[in-house]
Structures are given as structure tokens and as C-alpha cells.
């Protein structure tokens, strides 16, 4: 009896479970791929489903099989998952966390994915120290550079007709170039003065960023100088021929240059104006406004102070421009004598402006001095009209001091702040220049912190140091000062030496007899401090003292001690400087260079 067909198809449910477990990868063996049946329908329904919770793993569950992908997906990397845009209320992870994405792609056999991971790591390492917000902000700024407004730099010869150019000599072309440079500079100056008023002064006044009084103090009378330079430009224009040449300009300059004395008040106020502007820059509104102007094309990447300082920089160029015109002017030309006169006029104007500016600067710093003791007040400070030099130095303890050298007195101060106002607190007793002694010290003679050489073994030794002190140590202390570098030390040395020189020349001829020239070595005459103190002050020539050790090549290698000073005071006064020098050479203690 033949079995029934239904009995032969009983194992099919087991085959169906295997097909389901294999996620319909391959058709059943022995059956065509398009064979319809209930198993095929169930397989299609499972493929369309989104959940695998209905599948129960069986003994034939195979984890080694992979889902087949299309070939075009092998090299495709979706960038949508790397969207950097996040909600505003969501915490943004640092950019360094993106490295985990690159590390997850391992092992990497595909070249495109490997290159992508390297790219992620490369820009992650470059941006580890910044947040994504700051990175995007800096990128947005750099992608839109502000175009800078540039001025024409064409030469006069470039605008000249070819036939006209051939008819002029090389010297005459250079002379016309110099005259054109003078005229072009006046035009640029007028534009800058108008720009300072239109782009800075008026908007800040209208927006109430600064008060009218503050703006007047900073800008001064810039509007009053515009007609002055327009007048020179008009005169040069009238003297210009149709072919573009100027035959004579000397008489124009002789008549016009004295009007530059109007800048005395403006230049004298520059120091106070700069200080007020720096103070107002602490205001966020002022800072934001100036920054926006700086990023605008009209500013040419120049800040406000650059525009305010343009008149001063223009003044110092006039002698150079006039000398350049004179250099290319023939000796038999009528302009030669007039140009020489014009050069003398502008030099006199600049001297007057510098003198007025120096007095104003001197008074500005005098008003900022703060005294801790009434004994520190010296009438020579208030009477000072010239500030020879000033700047920051360090004392032997490493503290920063601000030094002022007036024409008659040296003042050491410490910068302080009182009610948001910068002042200079007078430190110790000021030293009059006529009683000032300057000592040059070699590098390593003094250790910063107050210890002398050798006191603390192999420690850092001070460099670029010198000492200032009283001739008579009783009124005050000596000060060991340190400059930032050799250049600044030499500047201070030259400045103090220049201040001392007039008092050396004021000595009597008898006392100066036998004195060597500058930079030569001699011994200071030191009478006793008891009965002949007045004679000592009249005989001692204040100056630069270089202390030597048995050799003139090792100037400044030793330090004057208290014991040496007492021994010198104990000596009897000699009638002449020659005998004092002979005695010092016989003793072999030290040598001093006095200026």
C-alpha cells in the first residue's frame, strides 16, 4: 500500500524554522527560488517586520553568517550620524570624544573608512583645546576676511606723459617726485583728520559712549588743523603747471611752515589724552565700538590712537621731505636758498613743540607723585621743566621701581593705584643730580635678593646692573638697579651721564686742573667729612664711577664696602687732585672713573 502524499511532507515545518533562522538568505534545497507556499509567505512577512522578538534561537542558530550588503554600501559612510548641530538645551560633549568613533571602526579593512577615521583623529587633535562653539566661531570669522581700504601708491612719474617724461632729466624727475610726495602726504593727512572726526568722534558723542568733555580732551582741536593743511595743498596746486610740474616751491614753504606752531598745544596734550583713552578702553561699550571700527575697511587696520598720532608723525617728516627736495634741486636754482631757510624754520618749530611737550610731560608726572614723608618733597622736583628719561627698573630685592630723572633730581617711585587713578609713590629719598654718583657693576657682582657674590654658592647672578647713590651716604641709601637688557642699561647710563655733565663743567678751573677726559680713570678726592664737608662737595666731581680690581679691563668688578668708605674718610685732605691720585695708586685699593 502506497503512503499518502501528506505523510511525505511532514518534515517541512522543521525546514521552515531553518529558513526563518537563516533570515531567508538562500532558498531551500531542491526547490526553486520562486516556489510559492506558506513558508514563502511567512518569510516575506518576517522580512517586513521590524522586531525579532518572535524568533526563538534553536540548535541550528548560526552566528557566523552575515547579512548580505550591496557592493555600493562597502565604501559608503553616512555623514548624517555626524551632525554637529545639537539642541540649545543639550550638553555638548567635547570634540575629543569623537575619537571614540574612529576607534570603533576596527579592524578596518576598507580604505575609505580607514581614511575617514584618520581624518577624524587629525582634526580632533587640532581642536582638543577648544570647544566646538569656539571652533565654529573662529571658523566663521576667518572665512569672511574684512577687505582693507588701500591708498593709491602711484608715483608722479607713472602719471606723466611719455613725451613729457623724455624731456626731463633724471634729477628733475626725482625733484618732482619729492614735491608730489609732499603734496600727496598733505592730502592723506586731511583725509585722516576728517575720518577721525566723522568715524570716531561724532558717533561716540551721538551714542553717548563718551562725554563731550572727554572727547575734547582726547581729540583736541583736530578740526582747526584741517584748513591749515588745505591751505598748503591749495598753494601747491596753484603753483603746479598744466603738465604737472612745479617750478618753484621754496617761497610757499617759507610762508606756510610757521603756521605749524599751532600744534604745540595738541602735542603737549598727547600724553594726558593717551592716558585717558587707555582708561576709557576699560569700558565695554568703548572697547566694543573701537573693535568694530578696527575691523571696518575704512580704518586700514589702524586703531584710534594711530589716527590721533598722525599729526605728530607728520611733523617730524617735514625736515626729511624738504631735505629730499633740496637734494635733487640744482645748485643754481632759485629754490636752493629758500629751501635751506625753510629747513631752519621747521627745525625751529619742532624744537619749540618738543620743548613745550617736554614741559607738559614733566608736569604730568609731577602731579602723579605721592609722598609718604614731607622730607621727600624737594623744591627741585616742582621746579623741574624737563624730564630727561623715565622707565621701569628692578631694585636688588627684585621689586619693580619706576624711575624719573629730571634735569636736577633723580626720583625713585613705586606704581600704585588710588581710586582707579594711577600714581607713583616716592620710594626713599630723591637724589639731587649734583650729589649723584653712578657706579657701573659687572654681571654677577650682586645677586637679586640682596646677597653679594659668593654668599649663596652657585645661584643666579644679576645682569645689567648699576648703582646710584649719594656722595654723602648720610642723607639716604644707595640703590642697586637692574635693567631688562644691555641696551636699556646703556640708555640709562648715557642719560644719567648727560645729566651729570653740566655740574662737572660748573667746577672751578683750579679744581679741574689735572682731571682726565671722559672715560679715563682717576681717583676721587675725599676729604674728611667733619670740618671740610663743604670743601668736599666742591672738590668731588659727581659722575660715573667704575670700580676696578687691579686692571682697567675689569671695570666694575668690585663693590665699594662700608669699610673702604670709612678708610677714605679717615685720610687727610690733599691740596690737589694729582696728589690724591698718586696716593690711591700707591695704596692699590681701587680706581674710579668720574665723568
Swiss-Prot record:
Give the PH domain ranges. 386-501
Q: Which SUPFAM superfamilies match?
A: DBL homology domain (DH-domain), PH domain-like
CDD domains, from UniProt?
PH_Net1, RhoGEF
Q: Does the keyword Phosphoprotein apply?
A: yes
| GO annotations of cellular component type | cytoplasm; nucleus; plasma membrane
Q: Which UniProt keywords apply?
A: Acetylation, Cytoplasm, Guanine-nucleotide releasing factor, Nucleus, Phosphoprotein, Proto-oncogene
Where is this chain's protein located in or outside the cell?
Cytoplasm; Nucleus
The residue ranges of the DH domain are 174-356
Concerning SMART domains, the annotation shows: PH, RhoGEF
Quote the annotated effect of residue 492 to L: Inhibits transformation by N-terminal truncated form
Which cysteine residues pair off into disulfide bonds?
A: none
Q: Where's the motif Nuclear localization signal?
A: 12-19, 66-72
Q: According to the UniProt record, where is the region Necessary for nuclear localization?
A: 1-74
Drop me one GO molecular function for this one: small GTPase binding
Q: Where is the composition biased (Polar residues)?
A: 133-146
Annotated region (Disordered) at: 1-42, 127-151, 555-595
Residues modified as Phosphoserine:
21, 100, 106, 122, 508
N-acetylmethionine modified-residue sites: 1
The UniProt record lists the keyword Transmembrane helix: no
Its principal location? cytoplasm
Q: What is known of its domains?
A: The PH domain is sufficient for the nuclear export of the oncogenic N-terminal truncated form.
Q: How does it assemble?
A: Interacts with RHOA in its GTP- and GDP-bound states, and with CDC42 in its GTP-bound state. Interacts with the PDZ 1 domain of BAIAP1.
Q: What function is annotated for this protein? A: Acts as a guanine nucleotide exchange factor (GEF) for RhoA GTPase. May be involved in activation of the SAPK/JNK pathway. Stimulates genotoxic stress-induced RHOB activity in breast cancer cells leading to their cell death.
Supply any other comment.
Can be converted to an oncogenic protein by N-terminal deletion that leads to nuclear export and cytoplasmic localization. Transformation seems to require the activity of multiple signaling pathways. The physiological conditions for cytoplasmic relocalization are not known yet.
Q: Identify this protein by name.
A: Neuroepithelial cell-transforming gene 1 protein
**What is the native source organism of this protein?**
Mus musculus (Mouse)
Q: What is the lineage of its organism?
A: Eukaryota, Metazoa, Chordata, Craniata, Vertebrata
- The gene behind this protein is Net1
Amino acid at each position: 500500500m502506497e503512503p499518502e502524499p501528506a505523510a511525505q511532507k511532514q518534515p517541512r515545518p522543521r525546514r521552515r524554522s531553518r529558513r526563518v533562522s537563516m533570515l531567508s538568505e538562500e532558498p531551500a534545497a531542491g526547490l526553486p527560488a520562486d516556489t510559492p507556499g506558506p513558508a514563502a509567505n511567512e518569510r516575506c512577512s518576517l522580512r517586513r517586520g521590524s522586531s525579532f522578538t518572535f524568533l526563538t534561537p534553536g540548535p541550528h542558530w548560526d552566528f557566523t553568517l552575515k547579512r548580505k550588503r550591496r557592493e555600493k554600501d562597502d565604501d559608503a559612510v553616512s555623514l548624517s550620524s555626524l551632525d554637529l548641530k545639537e539642541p540649545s538645551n543639550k550638553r555638548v560633549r567635547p570634540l575629543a570624544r569623537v575619537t571614540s568613533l574612529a576607534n570603533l571602526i576596527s579592524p578596518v579593512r576598507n580604505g575609505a573608512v580607514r581614511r575617514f577615521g584618520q581624518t577624524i583623529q587629525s582634526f580632533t587633535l587640532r581642536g582638543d583645546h577648544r570647544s566646538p562653539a569656539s571652533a565654529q566661531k573662529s571658523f566663521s570669522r576667518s572665512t569672511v576676511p574684512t577687505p582693507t581700504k588701500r591708498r593709491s601708491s602711484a608715483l608722479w612719474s607713472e602719471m606723466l606723459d611719455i613725451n613729457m617724461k623724455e624731456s626731463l632729466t633724471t634729477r628733475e624727475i626725482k625733484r618732482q617726485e619729492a614735491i608730489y610726495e609732499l603734496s600727496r602726504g598733505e592730502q592723506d593727512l586731511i583725509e585722516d583728520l576728517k575720518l577721525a572726526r566723522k568715524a570716531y568722534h561724532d558717533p561716540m558723542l551721538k551714542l553717548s559712549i563718551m562725554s563731550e568733555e572727554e572727547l575734547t580732551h582726547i581729540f583736541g582741536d583736530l578740526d582747526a588743523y584741517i584748513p591749515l593743511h588745505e591751505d598748503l595743498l591749495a598753494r601747491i596746486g596753484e603753483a603746479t603747471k598744466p603738465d604737472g610740474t612745479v617750478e618753484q616751491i621754496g617761497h610757499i614753504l617759507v610762508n606756510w611752515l610757521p603756521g605749524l606752531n599751532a600744534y604745540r598745544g595738541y602735542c603737549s596734550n598727547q600724553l594726558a589724552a593717551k592716558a585717558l583713552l587707555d582708561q576709557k578702553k576699560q569700558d565695554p561699550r568703548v572697547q566694543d565700538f573701537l573693535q568694530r571700527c578696527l575691523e571696518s575697511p575704512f580704518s586700514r587696520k589702524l586703531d584710534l590712537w594711530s589716527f590721533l598720532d598722525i599729526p605728530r608723525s607728520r611733523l617730524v617728516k617735514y625736515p626729511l621731505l624738504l631735505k629730499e627736495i633740496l637734494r635733487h634741486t640744482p645748485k643754481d636754482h632759485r629754490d636752493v636758498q629758500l629751501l635751506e631757510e625753510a629747513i631752519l624754520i621747521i627745525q625751529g618749530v619742532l624744537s619749540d613743540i618738543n620743548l613745550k611737550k617736554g614741559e607738559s610731560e614733566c608736569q604730568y608726572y609731577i602731579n602723579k607723585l605721592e609722598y609718604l614723608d614731607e622730607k621727600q618733597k624737594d623744591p627741585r622736583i616742582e621746579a623741574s621743566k624737563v624730564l630727561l628719561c623715565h622707565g621701569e627698573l628692578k631694585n636688588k630685592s627684585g621689586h619693580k621701581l619706576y624711575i624719573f630723572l629730571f634735569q636736577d633730581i633723580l626720583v625713585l617711585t613705586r606704581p600704585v593705584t588710588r581710586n582707579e587713578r594711577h600714581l607713583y609713590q616716592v620710594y626713599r629719598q630723591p637724589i639731587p643730580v649734583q650729589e649723584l654718583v653712578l657706579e657701573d657693576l659687572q654681571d654677577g657682582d650682586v645677586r637679586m635678593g640682596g646677597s653679594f657674590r659668593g654668599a649663596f654658592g652657585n645661584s643666579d647672578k644679576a645682569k645689567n646692573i648699576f648703582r646710584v647713590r649719594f656722595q654723602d651716604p648720610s642723607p639716604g641709601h644707595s640703590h642697586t638697579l637692574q635693567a631688562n637688557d644691555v641696551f636699556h642699561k646703556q640708555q640709562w647710563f648715557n642719560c644719567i651721564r648727560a645729566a651729570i655733565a653740566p655740574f662737572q663743567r660748573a667746577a672751578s678751573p683750579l679744581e679741574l686742573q689735572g682731571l682726565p677726559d671722559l672715560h679715563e680713570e682717576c681717583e676721587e678726592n675725599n676729604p674728611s667729612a667733619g670740618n671740610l664737608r663743604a670743601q668736599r662737595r666742591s672738590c668731588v666731581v659727581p659722575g660715573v664711577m667704575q670700580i676696578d680690581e687691579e686692571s682697567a679691563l675689569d671695570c666694575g668688578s668690585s663693590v665699594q664696602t662700608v669699610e673702604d668708605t670709612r678708610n677714605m674718610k679717615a685720610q687727610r685732605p690733599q691740596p690737589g687732585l694729582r696728589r690724591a691720585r698718586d696716593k690711591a695708586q700707591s695704596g692699590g685699593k681701587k680706581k674710579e672713573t668720574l665723568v
